Swiss-Prot record:
Membrane topology: Multi-pass membrane protein
SUPFAM superfamilies membership: Transmembrane di-heme cytochromes (SSF81342)
Taxonomic source organism: Lotus japonicus
Cofactor note: Binds 2 heme b groups non-covalently with two histidine residues as axial ligands.
Protein name: Cytochrome b6
Note: Heme 1 (or BH or b566) is high-potential and absorbs at about 566 nm, and heme 2 (or BL or b562) is low-potential and absorbs at about 562 nm.
Binding site for heme b 2: H86, H187
Subunit annotation: The 4 large subunits of the cytochrome b6-f complex are cytochrome b6, subunit IV (17 kDa polypeptide, PetD), cytochrome f and the Rieske protein, while the 4 small subunits are PetG, PetL, PetM and PetN. The complex functions as a dimer.
InterPro entries: Cyt_b/b6_N, Cyt_B6_PetB, Cytb/b6-like_sf, Cytochrome_b_N_euk/bac, Di-haem_cyt_TM
Compartment(s): Plastid, Chloroplast thylakoid membrane
Source species taxonomy: Eukaryota, Viridiplantae, Streptophyta, Embryophyta, Tracheophyta
Family from the record: Belongs to the cytochrome b family. PetB subfamily.
GO CC annotation: chloroplast thylakoid membrane
UniProt-annotated binding residues for heme b 1: H100, H202
UniProt KW keywords: Chloroplast, Electron transport, Heme, Iron, Membrane, Metal-binding, Photosynthesis, Plastid, Thylakoid, Transmembrane, Transmembrane helix, Transport
Length: 215
């Protein structure tokens, strides 16, 4: 085993990386409220795991979406638990993100030189809200359908380009299969990818600049 470790150590300098991680200074003023961002990340990872599990059974078509969700809840092994955890962690992620934003704002964590960290955090907040909007529609029940119809209809109030934006979001003039396909793609691929990228940027900047000082 030591030879295997030495082989990787010679090429990747694992010990140097470990020393850098474990030797990072944590300011004495840090308390439990500084963990809210990490809890949000944990909720996101739970979302990825449970969401991936549900893709084995979910069918993103207007005729089969609702039935596939029912199958997950009643027939698939532990499907009810996986979907429930997905829903609960989604609510928890939104709550923790809001509390994290308040903590950062109240402690002045957005000030120089951490402006870009704040900007990436705001982008992550928008992405989190987008997860909620797109995920809400996927069961394609009455609530999901009308929620999509209302949300995608909002841009119509924009002068000149409003109708084009609505058609872009829906995939056609009305809500239907194209809309569900778009929202499913956004929810399962585009948004997770963007979230992972901005989280990496967010945590890299925190790692570089350190935790902000007390108020």
């Amino acid at each position: 085993m030591s030879k295997v470790y030495d082989w990787f150590e010679e090429r990747l300098e694992i010990q140097a990386i470990a020393d850098d991680i474990t030797s990072k200074y944590v300011p004495p003023h840090v308390n439990i409220f500084y963990c809210l961002g990490g809890i949000t990340l944990t909720c996101f990872l739970v979302q990825v795991a449970t969401g991936f599990a549900m893709t084995f059974y979910y069918r993103p078509t207007v005729t089969e979406a609702f039935a596939s969700v029912q199958y997950i809840m009643t027939e698939a092994n532990f499907g009810w638990l996986i979907r429930s955890v997905h829903r609960w962690s989604a609510s928890m992620m939104v709550l923790m993100m809001i509390l994290h934003v308040f903590r950062v704002y109240l402690t002045g964590g957005f000030k120089k030189p951490r402006e870009l960290t704040w900007v990436t955090g705001v982008v992550l907040g928008v992405l989190t809200a987008s997860f909620g909007v797109t995920g809400y529609s996927l069961p394609w029940d009455q609530i999901g359908y009308w929620a999509v119809k209302i949300v995608t209809g909002v841009p119509e109030a924009i002068p000149v380009i409003g109708s084009s934006v609505v058609e872009l979001l829906r995939g056609s003039a009305s809500v239907g299969q194209s809309t569900l396909t778009r929202f499913y793609s956004l929810h399962t691929f585009v948004l997770p990818l963007l979230t992972a990228v901005f989280m990496l940027m967010h945590f890299s900047m925190i790692r570089k600049q350190g935790i902000s000082g007390p108020l």
